[in-house]
């Protein structure tokens, strides 16, 4: 092991002991605390992060993963991923400082934000971070002045109209402008070494990767014609973090592998990267949030006859809302569904319920239309799949939120991490069997791969 992570950084649990068990212990302790101050906290299963990594290597063996630090910069995550050998994709000075503070060398960092502050470019130059991205002439000029020895990656626009987050509205050079940018880089003696793209989060169409890889091949040809040594292809992110996503990770991987074989075949001398955030951390984190207040509202029309519920609704107020942990309600249009820390009895009546955050305005609604038993102030609600853009969010209500995270890992996952037991070393005869360190899905030999796109023409 490289020494980034030690046993003192997490709670070692035995097989069969779940994060929900640990949450129960922690919520009990928090409820019994005498300070009266109760705040939301996370439990993170680092073993889930390890399993996701092995799954990635199994299905995309030619791709070198970089972790998107801005997705979740909690130290436990950074340390376990550094231990696994990942590179780190940083968007700003603070993220570069953070990963270098834990010992990650500059050679494993890419500053992937194509629109950086001059201070961030100067920091990268001073601290040896040479791999930077750009997508416009202004950014190129800033790099020429502040970091002339940088190795630049040209970020191209993608067809991300089906994605939840359309990054092409903000970032990415059009194919029509790429030759001009490459020519300017050559005239300015700036080395362009590759191409990157990002299809956006929540893209339901894996063929978007194939189209972008085909487009990248065109830009590689332009760069090589102009004398640039093009040897890096960055696939960006957009990989699903949930097992129940519309498009399974294996399906995406199959499409990507087919496109890589066609446009960047093995042995072509191109180093292939990907920047993953949600993929690694979404399902690894669970958050516990307490009820701080409640209000009962009499319904005008009772649904008691249809549902057995009493004729009233209940509004619960939480210590976290959409301007903090539950920001996905605003940005990803999600509807968080809680699990109750205390299991209700079968004969308890259900009430139409809604959950609201602490902001004193009408937009801080976490969830509504829920049917829950009668809950009390001080009770805990548990939300799964809360690892992406939650832990270190900046709240509009009071600056940066320092949220407590308890890390856990099973002994089996710890031993696998220490020995780097990759799936390739397992029994190849049991291909259809999900092993403890598999990705958690059954493997199929019949994944449906659509046609690979051909490069678009450039006018």
UniProtKB/Swiss-Prot annotation:
Expressed in the medulla and chromaffin cells of the adrenal gland. Expressed in the Langerhans islets of the pancreas. Expressed in the inner part of the seminiferous tubules and in spermatozoa located in the lumen of the epididymis of the testis. Expressed in the cortex, hippocampus and cerebellum of the brain. Expressed in normal and neoplastic mast cells (MC) (at protein level). Expressed in testis, pancreas and brain. Expressed throughout the differentiation process from spermatids to spermatozoa in the inner part of the seminiferous tubules. It is found in: Nucleus; Cytoplasm; Cytoplasm, Perinuclear region; Membrane. One of its GO terms (cellular component) is dendrite. Changing residue 139 to A: Strongly reduces interaction with OAZ1 and unable to abrogate both the inhibitory effect of OAZ1 on ornithine decarboxylase (ODC) activity and polyamine uptake. Ubiquitinated, leading to its proteasomal degradation; a process that is reduced in presence of antizymes. May also be degraded through the lysosomal degradative pathway in a proteasomal-independent manner. GO terms for molecular function: catalytic activity; ornithine decarboxylase activator activity. GO terms for biological process: negative regulation of protein catabolic process; ornithine metabolic process; polyamine biosynthetic process; positive regulation of catalytic activity; positive regulation of polyamine transmembrane transport; trans-Golgi network membrane organization. InterPro entries: Ala_racemase/Decarboxylase_C, De-COase2_C, De-COase2_CS, De-COase2_N, Orn/DAP/Arg_de-COase, Orn_de-COase, PLP-binding_barrel. Coiled coil: none annotated. Gene3D superfamilies: Alanine racemase, Lyase, Ornithine Decarboxylase, Chain A, domain 1. Changing residue 124 to S: Does not inhibit interaction with OAZ1. Disulfide bonds: none annotated. Gly-70 is present instead of the conserved Lys which would otherwise be the covalent pyridoxal phosphate binding site. Antizyme inhibitor (AZI) protein that positively regulates ornithine decarboxylase (ODC) activity and polyamine uptake. AZI is an enzymatically inactive ODC homolog that counteracts the negative effect of ODC antizymes (AZs) OAZ1, OAZ2 and OAZ3 on ODC activity by competing with ODC for antizyme-binding. Inhibits antizyme-dependent ODC degradation and releases ODC monomers from their inactive complex with antizymes, leading to formation of the catalytically active ODC homodimer and restoring polyamine production. Monomer. Interacts with OAZ1, OAZ2 and OAZ3; this interaction disrupts the interaction between the antizyme and ODC1. Does not form a heterodimer with ODC1. Belongs to the Orn/Lys/Arg decarboxylase class-II family. ODC antizyme inhibitor subfamily. The N-terminus domain is necessary for its localization to the ER-Golgi intermediate compartment (ERGIC). This is Antizyme inhibitor 2. It comes from Mus musculus. The gene is Azin2.
